[in-house]
Design a protein with these regions (language model features):
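N-terminal low-complexity, Ser/Thr- and acidic-residue-enriched intrinsically disordered segments
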Residues: 1-11, 15
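Surface cap/lid and interfacial helix-loop subdomains adjacent to catalytic sites
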Residues: 5, 17-42, 58-65, 69-75, ...
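Gly/Ala-rich beta-loop-alpha elbow adjacent to hydrolase catalytic centers
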Residues: 7, 97, 101
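Active-site glycine-rich loops that stabilize anionic/oxyanionic intermediates
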Residues: 8-11, 51, 130
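Short, solvent-exposed loop/turn elements at domain surfaces
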Residues: 12-14, 55-58
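A conserved beta-strand->alpha-helix junction
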Residues: 39-42, 46-55
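Short glycine- and Lys/Arg-enriched binding-loop motifs that mark or flank ligand-binding interfaces
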Residues: 46, 93, 97
Length: 153
């Protein structure tokens, strides 16, 4: 069993933030990993920084924050990790997300429902989902399926 954790817009796991996000706290507590552990080193489970985090600049990537750019890459990362886990017999997953990360969590779950029907989503925790990608007010959502009807069973 593994956790796939999608953090919110601008959120990340660095010392530059004053407080860890709920997603990061949940991820670190999930299987007892130490608080100071680098989330990218965890085997099985996966923590994904929020869209538009400060990796590129002090203030973050404003266009990514505004339009949700980079979401497909994060979903692909999660699918790649799941594929590796599945090959070792892991077919039960938990998924969490906050803000746009919650929308990415739903998009990830919908990808699983369509492509990997043998994978079981045991738990899905979503905080304050922002299901908007691309230009504001459009229904297109840059190719993300953020409807919960396929993801929930």
């Amino acid at each position: 069993m593994a956790l796939y954790a999608f953090d919110g817009t601008g959120d990340e796991d660095t010392d530059r933030v004053s407080r860890d996000s709920n997603v990061l706290d949940f991820f670190r507590a999930y299987d007892g990993g130490p608080k100071n552990e680098d989330p990218s080193l965890r085997i099985g489970s996966l923590y994904l920084k929020g869209i538009g985090n400060r990796a590129r600049s002090f203030v973050g990537d404003r266009p990514a924050q505004a339009f949700g750019v980079g979401g497909h890459r994060r979903v692909r990362q999660a699918l790649d990790r799941l594929e590796n886990n599945f090959e070792t017999g892991d077919s039960v997953v938990d998924v969490i997300g906050f803000s746009r990360g919650a929308a990415l969590a739903v998009s990830f779950a919908n990808e699983l429902a369509g492509k990997c029907p043998r994978v079981i989503i045991r738990f899905m925790g979503l905080w304050d989902m922002v299901g908007q990608f691309g230009a504001p007010g459009r229904r297109f959502n840059a190719g993300h399926d953020v409807s919960a009807d396929r993801a929930a069973d």
